Each structure stands twice: as structure tokens, then as C-alpha cells.
Regions:
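Alpha/beta-hydrolase fold nucleophile elbow
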Residues: 25-37
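Short glycine-enriched nucleophile-adjacent loop
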Residues: 40-53
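Alpha/beta-hydrolase active-site loop
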Residues: 2-24
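Acidic catalytic loop of the alpha/beta-hydrolase fold
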Residues: 87-91, 119-120
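Short alpha-helix in the alpha/beta-hydrolase fold that links the catalytic acid
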Residues: 92-102
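C-terminal catalytic histidine-bearing segment of alpha/beta-hydrolase fold enzymes
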Residues: 108-160
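A conserved short beta-strand
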Residues: 53-67
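Short beta-strand/loop motif that positions the catalytic acidic residue
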Residues: 82-84
């Protein structure tokens, strides 16, 4: 098996978006990348691979409890929504917030932190409190509903 580094994930996100743009059954102006955890970090990191002036293949990005340890500030003008749990031990929101504070003024980012939510807050198969390695993860119905509402509102503003 060939090991795959998470460094390639942002490039994969953009490659898939560019591929989808070429498909006749896809409305190319409406492609949104959505990721959870490491995938959430990947969709945000994909923005770092775009220049401010570049015509992005992405209409928007949504990141659920993104893993931001290696995330760098970006210049791209693509709207982004980040949904995080204040109690997240796997992907602490403070790590993302430090990056978000370095974004250029006018960056189209909405960051929401749900006070009682943990990593996996929208995974209804999880109990509210479960061990994941040395960290605690868990479902939070209130955060799941609030995040779903937030995504719906965010996406309704991003459609033609």
C-alpha cells in the first residue's frame, strides 16, 4: 500500500471540483466542498491553494469540526463556513481560530462554535460521550440541528 499524506488532500479537493466543472450534468457555478474533521481541514486548506484573483472551481466551502493543525491563512475569495464544538478535543477550535484571525480583512468566513459540542457532534450513531483514542467525542442533538440550520442558510445565500 502506498502511504498518502494529508498534504495532498487540498489538491485532491480542487482536482475533483475541476473535474466536476467539466461534467455536463453539473452546474459548474454551484460546486461546494464539504468536509468533516481531517476532510474539513482539507476543504479549508484547498482555499490556500488558490490565489485571490484566481477563478475558483468552488462556489463555497463548509467544514465540520475541521482539523486545522497545518492550516495556513488563505487569500481566495471563496465563502467558507466552519462549524466547531467548543469541547472538541480532537480538533480544538482554538487552533482554527488562530488561523482565522490571520485571514485578510474581508475574507468571506463564518465560524460558529457550539458551546457544549464535541468532535462528531452531528453523528447521531455516537453516544453523547465516547472515547476516541485518548480524546472524548460525542453526539449533540442541539448542535447538529443548529449546524444544519446554519449550513442551509449559508448555502441559500450562495446559490444563483
Amino acid at each position: 500500500m502506498i502511504p498518502i499524506s494529508s498534504d495532498v488532500f487540498p489538491f485532491q479537493v480542487l482536482a475533483v471540483a475541476r473535474y466536476l466543472q467539466e461534467q455536463p450534468y453539473v452546474k459548474a457555478s454551484q460546486i461546494t466542498a464539504v468536509g468533516w474533521s481531517l476532510g474539513g481541514g482539507a476543504v479549508l486548506a484547498a482555499l490556500g491553494q488558490l490565489t485571490a484573483a484566481e477563478n475558483s472551481p468552488l462556489r463555497a466551502v463548509v467544514a465540520y469540526y475541521p482539523y486545522c493543525r497545518d492550516l495556513q491563512p488563505w487569500q481566495a475569495k471563496v465563502p467558507a463556513l466552519s462549524l466547531m464544538g467548543a469541547q472538541d478535543e480532537v480538533a480544538p477550535p482554538e487552533v482554527c481560530q488562530r488561523v482565522f484571525e490571520q485571514l485578510p480583512p474581508g475574507t468571506a468566513l463564518q465560524a460558529r462554535v457550539y458551546p457544549e459540542a464535541r468532535h462528531g457532534f452531528d453523528v447521531s450513531d455516537l453516544p453523547p460521550y465516547a472515547k476516541f483514542g485518548s480524546e472524548i467525542v460525542g453526539y449533540n442533538a442541539a448542535a447538529e440541528v443548529a449546524a444544519a440550520r446554519e449550513v442551509q442558510q449559508f448555502m441559500s445565500r450562495k446559490t444563483d
